[in-house]
Curated annotation (Swiss-Prot):
This is NACHT, LRR and PYD domains-containing protein 1b allele 2. The lineage of its organism: Eukaryota, Metazoa, Chordata, Craniata, Vertebrata. Activated by pathogens and other damage-associated signals: activation promotes ubiquitination and degradation of the N-terminal part, releasing the cleaved C-terminal part of the protein (NACHT, LRR and PYD domains-containing protein 1b, C-terminus), which polymerizes and forms the Nlrp1b inflammasome. Nlrp1b inflammasome is inhibited by DPP8 and DPP9, which sequester the C-terminal fragment of Nlrp1b (NACHT, LRR and PYD domains-containing protein 1b, C-terminus) in a ternary complex, thereby preventing Nlrp1b oligomerization and activation. It comes from Mus musculus. Pfam families: CARD, FIIND, LRR_6, NACHT, NLRC4_HD2, NOD2_WH, UPA-FIIND. Its main location: cytoplasm.
Length: 1177
């Protein structure tokens, strides 16, 4: 069975398998939508002020997605403000830096996501406000709607009101109908209602904004030919000359412009185009897409049904990222619901959706001739760059009045209110009909190759060779010439369209593309629309040769390489690329790097995808959906990308699918927690192809690794290499791992954690240093068990660096970083990048000490711990400050994050250089009490998703167990304050995994558990309280804990389970005796090994068994042999103690455990003599 057919049949099963999960997600989404709509009624300015949530209007006077449609034909009228906007970094004289081709070297960073209110904001580099903003984007992505929204928002006082006094909107397709205009007439035409005399308007040109929508649509060249003729605002000029003079700054040079266009190659249309700010529209945000689908339908039940259907189909969900396609999908579903039959949509391409739309909308059986005429009209307009047609144009093509009336009623055509002209509902729709015309014109055999040549030459003349595959008309042609496309067209037009003949047309188009052109996203889009296996295999095979650089990019040299680099900014691009590489037999590995990080090098021939925009659950869903069918792919590297629980679920589902043959999986630094390990363990048991799994730099803890061990014990597991952070595991778990290795000689468990020394140079920023450090660490071949540390240590180029306690009561600590490099502390989540050896002091502070003196709480929300850091000036080139906002789920912009500095003269808010999941990055920082805050509106405080932790403490009193359960934001200063408070009353913490889902401040949760538990109170509120304040908790009385108990936390509103833990009697270790106050004030506490050094040297009689237990854990081969070489037991112990000077506390804990196993009576005797206090494990 062909793979494309196989995938189509599989779609139904996907919908069933994911149905229940999607239902849960849908109802959560609906509640969020309804809550947002309620908020908008009370605070309509919220979106523009802060850009966190989309806005939906449902009033009759508002415009729909494509405002020229008759309002009477629709029951929903929306505008949307949460289109994703990507500002490109394009220096003067450069081309488009965000490449759309494969290259043999790493692409430069292309830009960042911005909000609509930032369009005319200061440039990050120059801090100058742009006068020209170019809005570009794919067909149907929402450029025109965005332009109209800017005008409307300005009129309503929500946007740029202080920036501009007058805003003029022009549709270039309509403007091109005017032959001549004066500047005064142009301004009058751009206003809904005249607001002031022309001389008053022109008196402040710096306060004028001209919006030109669709600047590339008309066939004109806007050259500034005769600037001296445009000095008089009352003198008429050809429209293209007038616009060219405006854009060329010959007249009104201080005025600002906003242009929308499909292409960035505007120099051929506007030769005198000045330096601009380029912003690309990437389509719907996830939340906006859900709102649009849900609110499209008048009845809520239909909206829910449509949303569930789209969410259950990863391909359809991705296609709906484009607003125009989303409208087509909703329209098709609405027609099916109205007709009362089965409601289903299995279309995999935009072309297939368009064909479905026509079959449901137009009564084709009675209108085949008229439909052909409509296609001819569309084609003529495309070739001549016309989108408006007169009645005579329609008659010339043979369209009668009845047919025009039907096309108007169905919404395919629309009549312009301001004139007697007609247009297609959307330019994309006109291009689709034009593509059908090409095929119909070529359907008569008498034309043969000559007709094909004529069609292809027309396409090349219209779009150019270099941009041929970017044109929607060409992409639709590829889709229509597919097997399914031709079959549907034959039904529509009741004619025969021989497949072999049509295939020739495709090869004609491919042959006319620019020779030696690099493989580009446009070509991949065309191949995706066609989905023919033979064509895909042939073309993708040809693309594996030499990659030639863009002629405008002198930094990319011609290289033969086995690595292909490509930037993907949207889920649509991600879907297209991952679909096409299935047919690249030589492409064995795939690597996805977020925000340009280098990742961890896989050696097989691979493709590296770069993503400068946030990766959402929808992104992971389509990526792993395509992964199911890629039998060629053997390696997948997702290192450095934070993965949600849902994302790991999608990954694991893909890996156990029969078509997936993945052998190597790298998930280094992906934010994995113990909860994820049950999913990974199931993969180890079910995925027989997996040979290598790297899970380093994740907080898996003992519980997570134990789950992995269950999967490793399964006979179906064929894993050969497992990499883990062994330094953070207990001796018992490490022993369990060693036992697994002994029982399975093919399995190797390690932790590559010893990089070579790396000294940063002046040319490396903090990202380069961090990347280099990671790569060196990964490439090292050192024994992983030679170095162990704790979560309180700072991990750097040479391993762990101990943190010293300076003043315990003040929570003041000191760390002496020994050399240049990047250092990370797992417990505080602080990162430092330093250029030389430096001593850093860190004090935990309470926000309440500083916030009460400022109005910050009204406009900002605390989203991270507050530290007072002191370091030598210039030694620290970057600091990573932790925050607990979930970037993958929040609607907040990264520009809303600020670092609050509390200095002697007051508070300063600094914009971080970068915002990453869990961190904000400051380059060349100055230090003072500092922490991360988020700019919000008060009503949005409860809509910010955060990461949280659960803390469980227990105390055993006369065999009765009492538990304290906390639910707090992931803030180390709060955790430390709770630890200290609980320790006063001899409560001991039990480590359990945190909640998987993101939670919301102010939400309430119900605590429950096994029978016979007394819980007070049963309700907990998740709130942020300063570390100096009392934290909320539930007290749980267990009684005599003879068996395991289960604890659960559920959302009070939905009763959805958000966390559960199983407590076993073995989790309760005897509490340590209270330590004297004098000891508490000491800088550090003596370990059992150091307390009893003299006794241990004298009384350990069997040293070799002790050494055997330490071999591979604490002692490497050289150290092991050096100790054994000593003559007497006393000398061996002295040698061992000499080596222990460099050991961390974790290493000493392992020594203590080994000593208890080999000399239990000696350990008990020493404990009794010291009063029973042991500071070993």
């Amino acid at each position: 069975m062909e793979e494309s057919q196989y995938k189509q049949e599989h779609n139904k099963k996907v919908a069933q398998d994911e149905g229940q999960e999607d239902k849960d997600t849908i109802f959560e989404t609906i509640e969020a939508i309804e809550a947002k709509l309620m908020e908008l009624k009370t605070n309509p300015e919220s979106t523009f002020n802060y850009g966190i949530f989309p806005e939906v209007y449902m009033n009759q006077g508002e415009e729909i997605l494509y405002p020229a449609w008759s309002l009477k034909e629709e029951n929903l009228f929306q505008t949307f403000k949460s289109l994703r906007l990507f500002q490109k970094l394009c220096p003067r004289g450069s081309g488009n830096l965000v490449k759309k081709s494969w290259y043999p070297c790493v692409p430069e960073e292309g830009g960042h996501i911005i909000n609509i209110q930032d369009l005319f904001g200061p440039n990050i580099g120059t801090q100058k406000e742009p006068q020209l903003v170019i809005i570009e984007g794919a067909a149907g992505i929402g450029k025109s709607t965005l332009a109209r929204q800017v005008k409307r928002a300005w009129m309503e006082g929500e946007l740029y009101r202080d920036h501009f006094q007058h805003v003029f909107f022009f549709s270039c397709r309509e403007l091109a109908q005017c032959k001549k205009l004066s500047l005064a007439e142009l301004i009058t035409q751009g206003q809904d209602v005249p607001t002031a005399p022309i001389n008053q308007i022109l008196s402040h040109p710096e306060k004028l904004l001209f919006i030109l929508d669709g600047i590339d649509e008309p066939a004109w060249v806007l050259a500034d030919q005769n600037p001296e003729l445009c000095l008089y605002w009352s003198q008429t000029q050809p429209v293209h000359t007038l616009l060219g003079s405006l854009l060329g700054k010959s007249i009104l040079p201080e005025a600002s412009f906003l242009l929308t266009t499909r292409t960035t190659a505007l120099q051929k249309f506007i030769p005198s185009l000045p330096q601009s700010c380029q912003v690309e529209v990437l389509g719907f945000s996830d939340f906006e897409q859900e709102i649009y689908i849900y609110k499209y339908f008048a009845k809520q039940i239909f909206g829910i049904k449509a949303l569930m259907m789209v969410e259950s189909n990863p391909v359809l969900l991705t296609l709906c990222e484009v607003p125009w396609v989303c409208w087509l999908v909703c329209n098709c579903l609405k027609k099916q619901m109205e007709q009362g039959g089965d409601v289903s949509l299995t279309s995999q391409t935009t072309t297939a959706i368009c064909l479905k739309y026509i079959s449901l909308t137009i009564p084709v059986h009675h209108m085949r001739t008229q439909l052909r005429a409509l296609c001819s009209l569309a084609a003529e307009g495309i070739w001549k760059r016309r989108t408006l047609f007169s009645e005579s144009d329609l008659c010339k093509q043979g369209l009668d009045e009845d047919a025009v009336a039907i096309f108007l009623k169905t919404g395919v055509l629309q009549k312009q209110a301001s004139s007697l002209s007609y247009s297609f509902a959307h330019l994309c729709l006109q291009e689709f009909f034009a593509s059908m015309s090409c095929i119909l014109e070529d359907s008569e055999e008498r034309h043969g190759d000559m007709e094909m040549d004529r069609i292809v030459e027309t396409l090349v003349e219209r779009y150019g060779r270099q941009n041929l595959f970017e044109a929607p008309t060409v992409r639709f042609l590829f889709g229509l010439l597919s097997k399914e496309g031709l079959k549907e067209m034959e039904k529509l037009f009741s004619c025969s369209l021989p497949g072999k003949t049509k295939l020739k047309l495709l090869w004609h188009i491919l042959g006319k593309s620019q020779p030696h052109q690099p493989p580009c996203l446009g070509l991949l889009h065309c191949l995706y629309e066609n989905q023919d296996m033979k064509l895909l295999t042939h073309v993708m095979h040809d693309l594996q040769g030499t990659i030639v650089p863009d002629t405008d990019d002198i930094t990319h040299t011609v290289l033969q390489t086995n690595v292909k680099h490509l930037v993907v900014r949207t889920d649509m691009e991600l879907m297209v690329v991952t679909f096409c590489i299935q047919f690249c037999s030589h492409m064995r590995s795939l690597q996805l790097n977020m925000e340009g990080q280098q990742g961890y090098a896989l050696t097989a021939p691979r493709m590296v995808l770069y993503r400068w925009t946030p990766i959402t659950n929808a992104s992971w869903k389509i990526l792993f959906y395509n992964l199911k069918f890629n039998s060629n792919l053997e390696g997948l590297d997702l290192s450095g990308n934070p993965l949600s629980y849902s994302a790991v679920q999608y990954l694991c589902d893909a890996m156990i699918y029969p078509g997936c043959q993945l052998k190597t999986l790298w998930l280094v630094e992906c934010g994995l927690t113990p909860t994820y390990c049950s999913l990974l363990a199931s993969v180890l048991s079910a995925c027989s192809s997996l040979r290598e799994l790297d899970l380093q730099l994740n907080d898996l803890c003992d519980d997570g690794v134990r789950m992995l061990c269950e999967g490793l014990r399964n006979r179906a597991c064929n894993l050969r290499i497992l990499r883990l952070d062994l330094y953070s595991l207990s001796a018992q778990v490490i022993t369990e791992l060693r036992t697994l290795e002994e029982n399975n000689l093919k399995l190797h468990i390690s932790s590559i954690w010893m990089p070579q020394m790396m000294v940063p140079t002046e040319n490396m920023d903090e990202e380069d240093i961090l990347t280099s450090f990671k790569q060196q660490r990964q490439q090292s071949g050192a024994n992983p068990m030679e170095i162990l540390g704790t979560e309180e240590d700072f991990w750097g180029p040479i391993g762990p660096v101990a943190t010293e306690v300076v003043y315990r009561e003040r929570n003041l600590y000191r760390v002496q970083l020994p050399m240049a490099g990047s250092y990370h502390c797992p417990s505080t989540r602080l990162h430092f990048v330093v250029t030389r050896a430096v001593t850093i002091e860190i004090e935990f502070c309470a926000w309440s000490q500083f916030l009460d003196k400022t109005p910050l709480q009204q406009s900002h929300m605390v989203v991270g711990p507050l530290f007072d850091i002191k370091a030598e000036q210039g030694a620290v080139t970057a600091v990573y400050l932790p925050h607990f906002v979930s970037l993958k789920d929040t609607k907040a912009s990264t520009f809303d994050f600020k670092v609050a500095h509390f200095q002697e003269h007051g508070m300063v808010l600094e914009t971080p250089d970068r915002v990453k999941p869990g961190y904000t990055v400051l380059k060349n920082p100055s230090f003072s009490p500092m922490g991360v805050v988020l700019r919000i509106i008060p009503a949005a405080r409860h809509f910010i998703p955060i990461t949280s932790i659960t803390l469980i403490y227990y105390r055993v009193n006369q065999e009765e167990v009492t538990l304290h359960l906390y639910l707090v934001p992931n803030d180390c200063t709060i955790q430390k304050a709770i630890d200290d408070e609980e320790m006063k009353f001899q409560f001991v913490r039990i480590n359990k995994p945190p909640p998987v889902d993101n939670l919301f401040i102010g939400s309430r949760y119900i605590v429950s558990g096994s029978e016979n538990l007394e819980i007070t109170p049963k309700e907990l509120e998740l709130c942020y309280r300063s570390s100096k304040e009392f934290q909320l908790f539930s007290e749980i009385y267990v009684g005599n804990m003879g068996s395991e108990i289960k604890l659960q936390i559920k959302n009070k509103k939905h009763m959805k389970l958000i966390w559960e833990a199983l407590l076993k009697p073995g989790d309760l270790r005897p509490a340590l005796p209270r330590i004297a106050q004098a000891l508490k004030d000491a800088p550090s506490l003596l370990h059992f090994m150091d307390q009893h050094r003299e006794q241990l040297v004298a009384r350990v009689t069997s040293v070799d068994p002790l050494l055997d237990k330490l071999h591979g854990l604490v002692l490497n081969e050289e150290s092991y042999e050096a100790v054994r070489a000593e003559n007497t037991n006393q000398d061996k112990m002295r040698k061992l103690f000499n080596l222990s000077r460099s050991w961390s506390r974790a290493c000493k804990d392992l020594f203590y455990q080994a000593l208890k196993e080999t000399h239990p009576h000696l350990v008990m005797d020493l404990l009794e003599k010291s009063g029973g206090v042991s500071l070993g494990s």
